[in-house]
């Protein structure tokens, strides 16, 4: 419906929550934050995975309407204690949740499905001047198409800044980012690999979001940089197609979610689906987080005995000889028919 812009598909929210928290986690007193919370789909999935009585929710979103819906969501999900932490405002220019000394508050879990592209030319320079917070820089203002400014790059940096030293986070981003070759995109990508913050990337099927045709991926961060290998998954072929009005959409089914979660947790290599690679391997591949670039190219060789080889060659030769003979016969037949043709002066004469 019309609130699609505030909504993350539940399946993606489940994948993010299960992978960040685990399926048998026994956590207490943890903090969860979303800097672009919308109506709270990601936060609700996270709270449900942890246990609503074991966590506190913090959020900020520029939309008053979605913040109101998030408050309602908290009440319906036994999270009323977190109501004072739902804030309407611009997270990038005026982050609300701070420590007493004025620095950004740090959380155990941070999740985000931020806007990808937005005209933020009016406060771009303000952000760019804060080089500590935006360590990889801020996209410049283009001469045309200001609404194509990649604001999500600011949210990636803000998310990482908002994690405790052992905190974990996940963010939905356009898939183009994971093979970025230049600009702020490239600086963010190299930093999250060099610092070993990113430990997983899942590329989702096309058309999983109601409001965008953009292909999306989910990045997973561990501020403790404890992973030895990064798990990369190409889930683009999963899910089932359905129609929403005139639009074709795709949704992940329960089996798809389980496959993604189990493959990710076990860091399994599955042909044409997933691969676990070291940070050095990622650097060798030009910092690509695209699973497909690491898949082996397979050439199938068939083992045969010398006798089988000789039999096959004899059959090929016999077949070729037969075809040559047939060709020669046809050639002679055509030549005979051509020889039999004579010029007839009376053809076409009515007399």
Language model regions located:
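Conserved S-adenosyl-L-methionine
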Residues: 2-112, 117-121, 125-128, 173-176, ...
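A conserved structural/catalytic subdomain of Rossmann-like adenosyl-cofactor enzymes
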Residues: 104-351
């Amino acid at each position: 419906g019309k609130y699609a812009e505030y909504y993350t598909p539940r399946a993606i929210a489940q994948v993010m929550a299960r992978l960040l928290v685990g399926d048998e986690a026994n956590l207490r007193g943890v903090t969860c934050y979303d800097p672009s919370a919308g109506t709270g789909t990601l936060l609700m999935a996270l709270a449900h995975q942890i246990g609503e009585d074991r966590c506190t929710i913090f959020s900020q979103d520029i939309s008053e309407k979605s913040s109101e819906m998030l408050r309602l969501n908290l009440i319906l999900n036994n999270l009323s204690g977190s109501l004072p932490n739902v804030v309407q405002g611009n997270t990038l220019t005026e982050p609300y949740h701070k420590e007493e000394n004025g620095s950004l508050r740090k959380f155990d879990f941070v999740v985000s499905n931020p806007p990808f592209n937005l005209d933020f030319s009016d406060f771009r320079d303000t952000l760019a001047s804060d080089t500590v917070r935006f360590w990889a820089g801020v996209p410049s203002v283009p001469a045309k198409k200001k609404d194509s400014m990649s604001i999500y790059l600011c949210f990636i940096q803000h998310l990482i800044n908002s994690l405790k030293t052992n905190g974990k986070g996940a963010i939905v981003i356009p898939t183009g980012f994971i093979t970025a070759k230049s600009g702020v995109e490239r600086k963010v990508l190299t930093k999250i690999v060099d610092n070993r913050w990113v430990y997983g990337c899942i590329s989702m099927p096309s058309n999983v979001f109601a409001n965008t045709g953009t292909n999306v991926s989910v990045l997973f961060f561990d501020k403790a940089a404890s992973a030895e290998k990064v798990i990369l998954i190409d889930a683009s072929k999963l899910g089932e197609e359905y129609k929403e009005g005139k639009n074709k959409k795709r949704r992940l089914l329960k089996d798809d979610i389980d496959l993604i979660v189990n493959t990710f947790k076990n860091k399994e290599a599955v042909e044409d689906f997933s691969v676990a690679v070291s940070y050095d391997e990622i650097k060798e591949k030009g910092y690509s987080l695209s699973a497909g670039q690491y898949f082996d190219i397979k050439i199938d060789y068939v083992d045969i005995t010398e006798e089988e080889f000789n039999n096959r060659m004899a059959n090929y030769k016999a077949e070729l000889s037969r075809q040559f003979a047939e060709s020669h016969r046809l050639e002679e037949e055509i030549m005979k028919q051509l020889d039999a043709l004579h010029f007839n002066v009376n053809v076409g004469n009515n007399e």
